[in-house]
């Protein structure tokens, strides 16, 4: 069956705050479109639902925001049921004497709850508790019942809540988190997918990429609706960018020199100090690509390109302002390399479209076989990529049918393709 056409939205139900409902056949006359979005740099999933209605449900339910929306989608790649969407906004781009078109922007309950004063972070978080435990407790404080996929951190960190929103605090902690295994394994990502919340290190994602690839896609010029093998073909791939030397240099992708000073003790010299270079750290980190160190001219690989001076900020500063160089909280140079990893991960950005596939999620590694004009497989640009952004789109066609695609933005830090692990069983094999 074709992944492009064989989709059904079997249930759409809007429940007002006083229990009134509108659903297909009862207040909702038709569904025009549904867009679903997730990203490894977004703490919440998002969706847009476009419907037609012959009733004035905005006034009759009424709809004012935070109403519950339930959606069930059946597709050959899987059935997905969303039960806890809430309405963030509603617009009415078209209306007539017979029907109206309504567009709902949907968000998650946790995204709303984190804005409330009672859910802001106010307590002191113990500096002896692992960061991963802090992250789990912060999410649970929002009352979430979603699955939490939280990687254990090697370091602990203490801080005060300062009335921060939950997601802001987790992002702040992610930059200071270190993965187990030693070395320069700093830098975590926090995001949400349809299967729950994720908190994972860049290194662990990269190191397991070859064995955790869930799908493999092959570039084609077109897709046939009658050929099942075309369900895993790549349409219209293009690189948004492939390196951006000046911008990356200014954002410390190729190295930095950061000096820290303690505003409480005001020492005569900067301490601690951290210096990193692209060539010096390359072999110490895990990567998605398989090629050796990229050769850069003019000494870019061997010299810091971003110089900065920052105050030392301990999350729970001691009264005398002393810094313990042996503690993870007291040594920002241990986790300052996370900035370089975030930037290197964004070195290549490839956009593409595939037939809709609910087995894909942001943060999953996929294998992409790209072609070189008149030469077949391009082993330089092909290989394992990380899904950065994912958008499922369902549309009503002019003929009244449905078509559905998944738009992807994929990233990686290096070039090269030596083939995926032969022990991996792909979902489409």
Question: At which residue positions do the language-model features occur?
Answer:
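Short beta-strand-centered interaction patches in the first periplasmic/extracellular domains
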Residues: 101, 110, 149-243
């Amino acid at each position: 069956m074709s992944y492009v056409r064989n989709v059904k939205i079997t249930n759409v139900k809007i429940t007002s705050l006083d229990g009134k409902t509108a659903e297909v056949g009862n207040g909702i006359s038709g569904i025009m479109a549904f867009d679903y979005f997730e990203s490894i740099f977004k703490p919440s999933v998002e969706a847009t639902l476009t419907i037609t209605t012959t009733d004035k449900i905005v006034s009759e339910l009424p709809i004012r925001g935070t109403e519950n929306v339930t959606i069930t989608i059946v597709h050959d790649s899987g059935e997905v049921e969303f039960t806890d969407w809430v309405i963030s906004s509603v617009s009415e781009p078209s209306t007539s004497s017979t029907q109206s078109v309504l567009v709902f922007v949907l968000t998650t309950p946790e995204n709303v709850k984190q804005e409330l004063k009672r859910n802001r972070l106010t307590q002191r978080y113990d500096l002896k508790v692992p960061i991963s435990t802090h992250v789990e407790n912060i999410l649970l404080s929002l009352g979430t019942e979603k699955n939490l996929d939280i990687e254990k951190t090697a370091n602990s960190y203490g801080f005060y809540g300062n009335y921060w929103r939950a997601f802001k605090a987790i992002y702040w902690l992610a930059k200071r988190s270190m993965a187990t295994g030693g070395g320069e394994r700093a830098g975590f990502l926090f995001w949400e997918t349809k299967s729950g919340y994720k908190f994972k290190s860049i290194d662990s994602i990269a190191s397991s990429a070859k064995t955790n690839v869930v799908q493999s896609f092959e570039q084609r010029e077109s897709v046939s609706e009658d050929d099942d093998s075309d369900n895993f073909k790549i349409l219209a791939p293009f690189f948004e960018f492939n390196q951006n030397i000046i911008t990356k240099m200014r954002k410390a992708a190729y190295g930095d020199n950061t000096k820290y000073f303690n505003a409480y003790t005001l020492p005569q010299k900067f301490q601690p100090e951290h210096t990193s270079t692209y060539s010096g750290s390359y072999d110490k980190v895990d990567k998605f690509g398989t090629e050796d160190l990229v050769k850069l001219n003019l000494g870019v690989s061997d010299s810091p390109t971003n110089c900065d001076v920052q105050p030392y900020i301990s999350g729970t500063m001691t009264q005398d302002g002393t810094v313990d160089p042996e503690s993870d909280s007291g040594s920002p140079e241990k986790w300052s390399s996370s900035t370089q990893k975030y930037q290197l991960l964004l070195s290549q950005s490839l956009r593409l479209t595939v037939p809709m596939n609910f087995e894909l999620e942001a943060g999953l590694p996929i294998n992409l076989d790209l072609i070189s004009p008149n030469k077949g497989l391009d082993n330089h640009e092909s290989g394992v990529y990380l899904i950065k952004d994912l958008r499922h789109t369902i549309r009503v066609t002019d003929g009244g049918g449905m078509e559905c695609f998944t738009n992807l933005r994929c990233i990686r830090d290096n070039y090269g393709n030596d083939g995926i692990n032969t022990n991996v069983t792909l979902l489409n094999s």
